[in-house]
A protein has these predicted regions:
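Ubiquitin-like/PB1-type beta-grasp interaction modules and other compact soluble beta-rich domains
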Residues: 1-161
């Protein structure tokens, strides 16, 4: 499906930081008896902002054709918050988006009253504070296939491209 891989040379120190981030996530998950509890979930919408703390995320098996049962992905955070009655949401399946010829993923279309429109909508990132924004956590893996371990934070934010 026209996949491109890029390789970037990084320092040993950077690799050690990435490894430590993963080790911290494993430790956090173990300390929570195998549950994924995200210390900070942030939602910055067009009209509303939310900050939830210590959110337990459970598997919803949205992509059962892709993953084994009970694999937890980033989108499960939104589904778990909705299940807890803390927000409402809509998901939308996209075969493609704009010039991205092949997407085939669910996207968060709406959180409460903030609904995607035109070239504006929600994107997300998850990981350690050390790699916030474009330092590594913000990537282009759809949230329904981004497997999470136990990130320090997960953020959905509104963007117009």
């Amino acid at each position: 499906d026209k996949t491109t891989l890029s390789f970037v040379k990084v320092t040993e120190n950077y690799l050690n930081q990435v490894y430590q981030t993963y080790a911290d996530e494993v430790k956090r998950r173990n300390e929570n008896d195998g549950k994924i509890i995200i210390p900070n979930v942030i939602i910055k919408g067009k009209t509303e902002n939310f900050h939830f703390q210590n959110v337990e995320v459970t598997a919803h098996n949205l992509r059962a054709e892709m993953f084994q049962p009970d694999v937890i992905t980033a989108i499960d955070t939104i589904l778990s918050l909705g299940e807890a009655g803390l927000l409402s949401y809509d998901l939308q399946w996209y075969e493609s988006i704009g010039t991205a010829g092949l997407v085939k993923s669910y996207w968060v279309e709406r959180i409460n009253q903030d609904k995607s429109e035109g070239r504006c909508g929600f994107v997300y990132e998850a990981g350690d504070e050390l790699f916030r924004f474009f330092k590594g956590n913000h990537n282009h893996i759809p949230s329904d296939i981004r497997v999470i371990n136990s990130p320090a934070y997960l953020e959905y934010f509104w963007i117009c491209i």
